[in-house]
Amino acid sequence: MGDIIRIKRHHYVHILDNNTNVTRCMVGPLVYTRKENERCLFNPKPCIVVPPRFYCIVQNPCVRDASGNPVIGENSSVMLRMGEEEICFEQEPFPLQPGEVLKREEEEWLFKLKLIPVNTGYHVRCLCDFTDKNSVLRRAGTEWLVEGPQTYVPRVEVEVLREVHAHIISPNTALHIRALVKFTDRTGVPREAGDLWTVRTVGAYLPAVEEDVIGTFQGITLTDTEAVHLEALSNFTDVYGKRRRAGERWLVTKEDASIHIPDVHEKVSGKVRAIVLNEKEYCVVQNPLGADGLNEFGRKEVRKGECRFFLHPQEELLGGMQPINVVSKDQALLLQAVDFFDDNGKIRRPGEKWMLHGPAEYIPDVNVRILEQRNLIALDKNEGIYVMNTTTGVVRVVIGKPYMLNENEVLWEKDLSPKVEELLAFANGCMSEGERNPSFKSTRVRHRVVRFNVQHNAAVQIYDYKQKKLRVVLGPNLVILSPDEEFTVVSLSGGKPKVPNLLHCLQLFLGPRFSSDRIVVETSDHARLELDLSYNWYFDVNREEPDAKIFSVPDFIGDCCKTIASRIRGAVAAEDFDSFHRNSAKIIRVAVFGRGENGEINTSLRFSANNLVVTNIDIQSVEPTDAKTRDSLQKSVQLAIEITTKSQEAAARHGKERKDQEARGKLERQKLLDKIEVERTKTKWLQLQAQSEAVQASGQSVAEAKAKAESLLIEVDSELKQAEMRAKAYRITAESELKKQKQKLELELEFTKRQNELDIMKARQIAETEAERVQRMVNAIGRETIVAVAQAGPEMQAKLLGGLGLKGYLITDGKSPVNLFNTAQGLIDAGSSAQEHS
């Protein structure tokens, strides 16, 4: 760089004096001659230009006087405020004094002023004390909000912490605000740190720096069927002007507001639906709200329809909405008082029961409990129920008429043993041990009377354990048990040989019936035999006065079979095998029935203990128990059977041969008789054949002549009939053609006649129409008008010719004929005119 420094306009250089080590700034336009002890630190630089709406930050700015010029210190150097910053806005281009530095961010030193839009603000904080342009003293650490819309002018004493956006409060919404420090809000209300409040003003809300927005809360729409329960979080006055205490709960409905926005001091406990009762419904509300607005805990209230209401907080709906108890004439309600109350003038005590009979509609009082609804129990003449009086404990049977229990009665269930229950499930009341079902469950209605149909010729024993009496019922009959009666179950032996308790019955069959048994006996020669026996028996009972004696032996079948088997064994033991084998039936009958005084075998065996009578015994089979004896006996029996069979076969064979010989003789004799009859028939046939040939020969010529004559006669008759038919057809054709022509002519004549009549009628109508038209025209125009029109033409012609000086005119081309009539008319007109003039 030379000694001469040319500095352009708005440019500057820094000159260092090496002697004093002081740098000064030179601003153009200027031509500066550098001294020997001076040095130019850099080539001329353009001055700092800050365009509109921009700014720059100068670090270590120089100290300026009141006129804005840099202050020079004692050593002739520019005084600087070291460590400080200065913001330069739009102004004339200026140079950087020695020591000043432009603050750069991301290599940029020129910054654009920021715009604060509508509903936005800058949260700023003061870094050091200063007084702003409004003469407000700002202390270090003070924070405030710069609201838009405006251009934010930065200061070195203020830093921007964040950008704050407004919260939009739409209709039916609100903001919950909390105070961070003690301050006075923009509405002039003083707030303490931690205070909460609600902002409901619709629009944009820009929170102050001392405020914290908890959130936006949507309003709750309240309808006729929906309300809301609220709970106070602290003591406050709600939006409806009511003072609320912390923990208090209340109801807000549509009558209070159509939309409720929850306050910051309250919370929504829940939404409730309206309870709508029609005229046939009611409900019970527990802990209802009293007149003082407080719940009356422990009290109940009945609300009847038609109505609509909301449950207040801590109110409970017991049992939901319930229909009114409709009691028909065949029904009743069993009611019980739970507390003292006045029932239409009658004092009811706690625990007291009474019946409400229909027909009626009943809504229970809060002090009344409905125990049950009872219906009239319909009973046939053979049906009944067990009824117990709860006061006395007496159980009785009601049979044959509809019955309604009173307040002191209940249906009593009669319990029966499982065996009896299972026997009642069988039609005849009997079952074998193998038919028992271990998982059987009775379907009997226990409060219904126990009934059992006793079959014909059967008996049932019933025991009354209260009176300790027995009664026997003979069938056919219907047994109905009283509350203290039980059936006597009969357990009998069964099977072959007899097994005890194999058969169980409710009824005892009186017979006659039969039983089978299998016993083993031993003869005197020690042959053991197995006998299959059947007995016929019956009970000898007086049907007028049946005796319980027949039930005195529990297992009469087993007892009878044992007695008979004992007698048979004793009798067989005294006989050898051959003797018993030949006379087994007689020996057994004598052993069982015994002999009478006259030595004859008795016909029956009577058991006096129960009047059982055995009338007959049948030996079904006798078999040795020893295998060898049984085989030898079978062989001997088989041999005897074979001998008998062979003798019977020989006798049958001899009889067959004799019958065959007799049959062959009869057959030969019949053959001879048949041959004689054939020859006789053949002779008769030959005679008839000869007669037929003679008749055939004589009758052939006569038949041919008759046939030809008949053929000719038929042809002549046929031609005659054809001629008659043709003549008849021709006559019919001619008559039809004549009739057709006649009808055609008549139709044409009628058509012509009608057409002529129509033409005449048409002409007449046209003439009448024309005459009427002319008449109407004449009437419309008038007689004078017609005369004037008729005279107008000649007068005009006369005037025209007079004007031309002519008396008349005739124009022709020599080819057209001359209208002499018009000429004559003109002459006449002219003559008449002359006469008029004369």
Swiss-Prot record:
Localisation:
Cytoplasm; Nucleus
- One cellular-component annotation, GO: ribonucleoprotein complex
Please name one Pfam family that this protein belongs to: MVP_shoulder
Task: Give the keywords, sorted.
Answer: Cytoplasm, Nucleus, Phosphoprotein, Repeat, Ribonucleoprotein
Q: Where are the MVP repeats?
A: 13-52, 53-114, 118-170, 171-223, 224-278, 280-328, 329-380, 381-433
**Family annotation (InterPro entries):** Band_7/SPFH_dom_sf (IPR036013), MVP (IPR039059), MVP_rep_dom (IPR041139), MVP_rep_sf (IPR043023), MVP_shoulder (IPR021870), Vault_2 (IPR041134), Vault_2_sf (IPR043179), Vault_3 (IPR040989)
Residues making up the signal peptide according to the UniProt record: none
Say what the protein does.
Required for normal vault structure. Vaults are multi-subunit structures that may act as scaffolds for proteins involved in signal transduction. Vaults may also play a role in nucleo-cytoplasmic transport.
- Quaternary structure note: The vault ribonucleoprotein particle is a huge (400 A x 670 A) cage structure of 12.9 MDa. It consists of a dimer of half-vaults, with each half-vault comprising 39 identical major vault protein (MVP) chains, PARP4 and one or more vault RNAs (vRNAs).
Q: Which PANTHER family match?
A: MAJOR VAULT PROTEIN
Q: What is this protein called?
A: Major vault protein
Organism expressing this protein natively = Trypanosoma cruzi (strain CL Brener)
Q: What is the lineage of its organism?
A: Eukaryota, Discoba, Euglenozoa, Kinetoplastea, Metakinetoplastina
